């Protein structure tokens, strides 16, 4: 996490994209969708499947798209801090 990030004020959603065996899936596109399924942001997962978004508290859907498959996960951060969630693709 960058030193300039104030975890007492920032809401960070972070995690990994994994396959059905729990192995990391690098290079997947990870989309952040709001509570009405509207596209908000997209990042490319690192070679180790890691991703990170800065978001507001609320309900979010993470959607991973890759050649190995697709998957969704829901996270509902209630406040500032790091909120971890893995997205499993099938």
Regions found by a protein language model. Give the residues of each.
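Beta-strand-rich domain onsets/edges
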Residues: 1-12, 21
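Short strand-edge motifs at loop-to-beta-strand transitions and within beta-strands
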Residues: 49-53, 83-85
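Hydrophobic beta-strand segments
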Residues: 28-32, 62
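Surface-exposed loops/turns
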Residues: 7, 47, 56-58, 79
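Structural motif
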Residues: 14-26
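Short, acidic Ser/Thr/Gly-rich low-complexity loop/linker segments typical of extracellular
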Residues: 35-50
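A short, solvent-exposed beta-strand micro-motif common in secreted/extracellular proteins
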Residues: 58-68
């Amino acid at each position: 996490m960058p030193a300039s990030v104030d975890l007492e004020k920032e809401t960070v959603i972070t995690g990994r994209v994994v396959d059905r065996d729990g192995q990391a899936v690098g290079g997947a596109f990870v989309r952040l969708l709001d509570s009405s399924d509207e596209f908000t942001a997209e990042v490319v997962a690192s070679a180790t499947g890691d991703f990170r978004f800065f978001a507001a508290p609320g309900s979010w859907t993470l959607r991973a798209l890759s050649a190995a498959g697709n998957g969704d996960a829901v996270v509902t951060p209630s406040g500032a801090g790091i909120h971890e969630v893995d997205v499993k693709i099938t």
